Amino acid sequence: MTNWFNKLLLFYFFIWPPLTTSEQSDLNDQRPPENRFDGEFLDLDFDEFDEEPSWRDNFVIRVSHQIFGQVNSHQVEPIPDFKIHKSASIENHRTGINVRYQNAIAPGWLIQGSWQGRIYWKEDYEYEANNNRIEDEYRINEIFVQRSTQGQSFRLGRQTVVWGETVGNSVLDVINHNEFRDFTIIDVEDTRLNQWMLLWDVFDKESSWSTFINLYPEFNPRPIRGGPFDFDLGYEINPVDRGNDPIFEIGSQWRRSYGSSDISVMAAYLYENQLRYERPIFPSDKANPVKNDYILIGFSANRAVRKLLLTLDVAMKRGVLIDGSTFVGVGSYNTPTNVKKDQVGISLGFEYGITNYQTVSLGVQLKKMKDERAGLSEEQVLSNQGVYGSWLFRYGNRLKNDDLELSLTLQGDLEGEAALLAGNAAYKINDNWTAGLQILTIHTNGTSELQYYKSDVRLGAALAYSF
């Protein structure tokens, strides 16, 4: 653990950006993308607020109902000679309400927040995990107050900070933690969880400096009880021990525009979002989660060439733990929790506007650990060796005057052992009603950790009312 003196030096380094006296041209363009509601797979556009003064104008409310399940009865063999029959079943049967609030309470002042509630009905995995009783859940997703002045902006509250240029697959998108609950949410943009932060932006005509401070870092939550990613480990897990030393995260990013290009340089002191776990010695004991702090140095750039946007992200991490399980939200139980390494990661991508209504993008992420075998015994096997990573392909099309939106997502690992295909369609019936369909299938080869989901086919439908 980095000692307190080093943390204090890092705090001083990150919090003191260069001064500027130029006016801010457009504060809204500098804001990071808003965290989407958990469980949403419809790409819905909220109506603009009415200009007439009314308390109701500051709210947007959406009520939705969703059914989603695995429809292909088949057999899988996650372990050699161990076969499991999988029957078609409903996984998600739930009603949701999402509330978004935004109010410019005074010149230069903004309050924004979002809240969600869920009711889990019969056949939903959370209903079954709750002893076959209706379950409900409520939480605040985002809430912050922002103060904007000439050339500066301060924002305090639960929010997200996103670094990197490669959409959906950037090695720099590591600040906020994530939660993959089930297969209705596969895009990283939809999985980011808000954290309590102070964000300070300083703007110049062609450049900006952004600094964040997180005084209570959080970690990727364990898979939801009863969900498709929840497996019986044979023992319980202790809560995170934050210890007596202060735990915080801090980072800064400098960004500059050069005509059709942008470059960014960033540095941060962070905690790994994914915990590792120490396997208990006795079955009656609980596993202890291991948190780890590290230093991130990054660089990103983009270049626009007519309808084509090229992106590059580079991340150098010093003092990260060995990558173990690649399974979402699970972490690792079989790799050492006391061996730190340095890692280099690169993301390459492009986005292309085929027409005003069609877009396509591709992002590739590559990682490499330095001296990955150093400090390990011959018996210890690494899940990821050499250069490893993932790829992500997306296609989007808007039809019928934007009333029908179609999207296709393909993603997999570089080794070719696993691939996921998802298709979505959202139809705007009128100004209030929207209907959506989703299909998702998984294909695996070799020793992929997704063998349990091999040949799964999932279908879903949702109906939403917004006002």
Range-by-range predicted roles:
Residues W16-I90, G96, R100, D187, ...:
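N-terminal periplasmic/intermembrane-space "pro-region" immediately following the signal or transit peptide
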Residues F59, P107-I111, G151-F154, E206-W209, ...:
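Repeated loop/turn-to-beta-strand initiation elements of outer-membrane beta-barrel proteins
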Residues I61-V71, G113-I119, L156-R158, T211-L215, ...:
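Transmembrane beta-barrel strands of outer-membrane/channel proteins
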Residues Q66, L270, F299-Q411:
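Detector for outer-membrane/organellar transmembrane beta-barrel domains
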Residues D81-S87, E126-R133, D182-I186, Y235-V240, ...:
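Extracellular loop and loop/strand-boundary signature of outer-membrane beta-barrel proteins
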Residues H93-V99, Y138-I143, N194-L198, F248-S252, ...:
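Hydrophobic, lipid-facing positions within transmembrane beta-strands of outer-membrane proteins
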Residues Q102-G227, G259, T444:
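Outer membrane beta-barrel
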